[in-house]
């Protein structure tokens, strides 16, 4: 047996049929079809290798390329065998190469069965140690098999002359080209993976830088943070685009880069959370900004309040200075009275403000031991009592001024601490008004009527000493001697001086207070109206009292009727409390006064009632022509303004004006005593008047003596009744 496949002999299995065996030499001709078939198969294998290289990556493409090369090397043998079989079928005769074809067909399975082995060898052995082609592998296996067959029983086998082998194909070069292409494709796949990973790394760095830029504005000012925060819509679009890019990268990147995609997802989640925190911080900053703006607007109101408090403080200081100056004047006058007193041996003041000659005569009489007249002693006692009462009253005034001073200081302290000082200053003004009224009631006539208290809530004078009034009545009796008359004249002169000085002080003081309170302004206007006539002098006897009063009341105007209505229009009253609206205040006033609800009073109805009443008075013709129904008391709709003043006060003021006119025309004001009942009976009915009359009977004092009409009266003679 031959030990090498290059020998010219081969073995053929003898079949059941005895075939003629011919020993032939090597064929000089090779079938062209068998040569073209391997080349076509090689070309197809190369094309298949290129297509597989486009879809697979790296090492798998290289492995498949090598396996396809092995299969391509085996396919020429199969094609050659098929060509031989085709030739047999076509011609129906056997050619000399039939035995060779059969041998090739028998040997082809061996080659195909060696395919897996070659694949295993390629995996375990370096490519440089592999054979150049599968044909070489087949030759090696052929040699080994022929060597093994030498030991096997060759019975039934016949040896024949084989054909000359065809020249070897240049498979090595093709294999080198395929390997180079596979390596290039693998390198391309590796480079794509590296590009994907690099893009992911760059994207991650960009996101980190972007998130760092968003976190920086937390320590910057509010304005910069607001400028760097992106709008919500743009942020959502950016996040959505990045998520789409990440999904595309996940679909295109191999599974080896999955951990990097997970880290990118975590980064995106972190970025979304940070964006939410940024939006929350932005909302908080906006709220704080609005709060700061509101706080910036508040100082404006505080500045206005501080300005008002400063004005009130300044007014309090001026009033305090006025009180101090008045106190100093009182002290000076008291010292002057004590200095003008001429005392006797027993220390009793014998003469107040007497002339030096009279004082010397009295002193000489005292030294001579002559006893004074009994009437003179009585007068001295009375004067001493009056002086004592005056000292007591001055002491009370001193205490009152001290309390006012303390209250003023406390009010100024409260105003300095930011508390509203209007209430304290109003109370202080009220006390000062009472002080002035007390001074008027003491006999120190300042030329002012008791109606000045109307601006300070219509309070009655506090300081009225009965002993002083009795002393003044005794002076008016005219049963005094020459010295008493002389003392009286001196006292009246000193009273005039005090009146002038106090009038000036009161005018200055009222001028300060009327800037803050409209009622004080009203009071000051009345006081100025009283001072219009410079010819007015203080009364010196009871007979001249009426003329002085009328002159002081009407002034230079010769039409007292119109002046009365004008005085009525100047008056202002305290508005009703505890109600809102015209109808509500009218109803509340009716229930409080008569227990009957009062409908809002109309201007036409009240005018008709007034004309009806004035028609009964023969002297009230001028008053009927000009009724005091101005817009100050009635609105545009003709309804009485119950929410600004009470209807009862308005009726009382009308009655006071009518009493003044009646006193001027007839000398008696009893003719208009039924005016109030006439008006109320029209609006409330007779039942309400009866109920009111029952209430009057239960009262132990005279209603007219203390009613609001007496408080509003401008004549001081009301205080001297009884």
Swiss-Prot record:
Residue stretches of biased makeup (Basic and acidic residues): 88-97, 465-536, 546-559
One GO cellular component, as annotated: cytosol
Residue(s) carrying Phosphoserine: 133, 144-146, 166, 559
Protein keywords: Coiled coil, Cytoplasm, Cytoskeleton, Microtubule, Nucleus, Phosphoprotein
Sequence motif Nuclear localization signal, residues: 482-502, 686-711
Location of region: Disordered: 1-180, 442-562, 691-722
Primary location group: cytoplasm
GO biological process: articular cartilage development; cell adhesion; cell migration; extracellular matrix disassembly; gene expression; gene expression involved in extracellular matrix organization; hemopoiesis; negative regulation of DNA-templated transcription
Record PTM Phosphothreonine, positions in chain: 150
Cell compartment(s), UniProt: Cytoplasm, Cytoskeleton; Nucleus
MF (Gene Ontology): DNA-binding transcription factor binding; transcription coactivator activity; transcription coregulator activity; transcription corepressor activity
Signal peptide: none
Domain of life: Eukaryota
Compositionally biased region (Polar residues): 1-10, 442-453
Coiled-coil stretches: 266-346, 373-401
PANTHER family the UniProt entry points to: CELL CYCLE PROGRESSION PROTEIN 1, PRE-B-CELL LEUKEMIA TRANSCRIPTION FACTOR-INTERACTING PROTEIN 1
Written domain comment of the UniProt record: The C-terminal domain (AA 443-731) contains a nuclear export signal. Association to the cytoskeleton through a N-terminal leucine rich-domain (between AA 190-218).
Binding partners and assembly: Interacts with ESR1, PBX1, PBX2 and PBX3. Interacts with TEX11.
Biological function: Regulator of pre-B-cell leukemia transcription factors (BPXs) function. Inhibits the binding of PBX1-HOX complex to DNA and blocks the transcriptional activity of E2A-PBX1. Tethers estrogen receptor-alpha (ESR1) to microtubules and allows them to influence estrogen receptors-alpha signaling.
Name of the featured protein: Pre-B-cell leukemia transcription factor-interacting protein 1
Organism the protein comes from: Rattus norvegicus (Rat)
Gene responsible for this protein: Pbxip1
């Amino acid at each position: 047996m031959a030990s090498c496949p290059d020998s010219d002999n081969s073995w053929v299995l003898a079949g059941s049929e005895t075939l003629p065996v011919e020993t032939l030499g090597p064929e000089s001709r090779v079938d062209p079809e068998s040569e073209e078939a391997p080349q076509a198969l090689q070309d197809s294998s190369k094309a298949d290798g290129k297509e597989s290289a486009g879809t697979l990556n790296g090492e798998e493409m290289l492995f498949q390329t090598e396996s396809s090369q092995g299969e391509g090397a085996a396919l020429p043998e199969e094609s050659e065998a098929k060509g031989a079989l085709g030739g047999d079928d076509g011609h129906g005769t056997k050619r000399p190469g039939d035995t060779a074809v059969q041998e090739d067909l028998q040997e082809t399975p061996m080659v195909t069965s060696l395919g897996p082995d070659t694949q295993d060898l390629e995996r375990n052995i370096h490519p440089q140690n592999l054979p150049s082609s599968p044909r070489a592998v087949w030759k090696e296996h052929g040699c080994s098999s022929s060597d093994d067959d030498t030991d096997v029983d060759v019975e039934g086998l016949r040896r024949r002359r084989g054909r000359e082998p065809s020249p070897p194909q240049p498979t090595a070069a093709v294999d080198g080209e395929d390997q180079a292409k596979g390596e290039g494709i693998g390198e391309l796949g590796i480079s794509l993976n590296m590009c994907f990973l690099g893009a992911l790394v760059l994207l991650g760095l960009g996101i980190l830088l972007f998130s760092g830029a968003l976190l920086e504005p937390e320590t910057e000012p509010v304005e910069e943070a607001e400028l760097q925060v992106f709008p919500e819509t743009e942020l959502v679009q950016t996040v959505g685009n990045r998520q789409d890019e990440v999904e595309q990268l996940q679909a295109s990147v191999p599974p080896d880069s999955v951990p990097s995609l997970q880290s990118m997802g975590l980064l995106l989640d972190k970025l979304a959370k940070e964006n939410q925190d940024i939006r929350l911080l932005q909302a908080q900053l906006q709220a704080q900004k609005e709060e700061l703006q509101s706080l910036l607007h508040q100082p404006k109101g505080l500045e206005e309040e501080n300005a008002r408090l400063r004005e009130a403080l300044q007014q309090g200081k001026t009033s305090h200075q006025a009180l101090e100056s008045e106190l100093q004047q009182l002290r000076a006058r008291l010292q002057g009275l004590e200095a003008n007193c001429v005392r006797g041996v027993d220390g009793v003041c014998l003469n107040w403000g007497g002339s030096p000659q009279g004082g010397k005569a009295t002193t000489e009489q005292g030294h001579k031991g002559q006893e004074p007249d009994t009437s003179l002693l009585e007068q001295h006692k009375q004067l001493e009592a009056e002086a004592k009462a005056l000292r007591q009253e001055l002491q009370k005034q001193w205490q009152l001024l001290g309390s006012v001073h303390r209250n003023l200081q406390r009010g100024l302290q409260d105003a300095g601490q930011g508390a509203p000082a209007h209430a304290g200053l109003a109370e202080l003004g009220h006390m000062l008004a009472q002080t002035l009224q007390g001074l008027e009631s003491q006999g120190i006539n300042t030329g002012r009527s008791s109606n000045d208290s109307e601006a300070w809530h219509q309070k009655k004078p506090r300081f009225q000493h009965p002993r002083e009034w009795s002393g003044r009545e005794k002076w008016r009796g005219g049963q005094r001697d020459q010295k008493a008359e002389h003392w009286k004249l001196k006292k009246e002169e000193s009273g005039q001086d005090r009146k002038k000085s106090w009038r000036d002080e009161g005018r200055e003081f009222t001028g300060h207070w009327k800037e803050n309170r409209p009622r004080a302004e009203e009071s000051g206007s009345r006081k100025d109206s009283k001072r219009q006539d410079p010819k007015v002098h203080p009364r010196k006897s009871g007979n001249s009292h009426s003329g002085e009063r009328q002159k002081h009341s009407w002034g230079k105007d010769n039409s007292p009727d119109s002046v009365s209505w004008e005085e009525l229009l100047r008056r202002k009253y305290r508005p009703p409390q505890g109600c809102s609206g015209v109808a509500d205040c009218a109803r509340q006033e009716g229930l409080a006064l008569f227990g009957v609800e009062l409908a809002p009073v109309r201007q036409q109805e009240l005018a008709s009632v007034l004309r009806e009443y004035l028609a009964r008075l023969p002297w009230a013709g001028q008053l009927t022509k000009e009724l005091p129904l101005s817009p100050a008391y009635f609105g545009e709709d003709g309804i009485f303004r119950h929410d600004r003043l009470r209807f009862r006060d308005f009726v009382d003021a009308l009655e006071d004006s009518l009493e003044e006119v009646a006193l001027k025309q007839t000398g008696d004001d009893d003719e208009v005593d039924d005016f109030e009942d006439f008006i109320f009976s029209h609006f409330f009915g007779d039942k309400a008047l009866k109920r009111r009359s029952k209430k009057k009977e239960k009262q132990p004092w005279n209603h007219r003596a203390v009613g609001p009409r007496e408080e509003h009266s401008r004549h001081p003679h009301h205080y001297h009744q009884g």
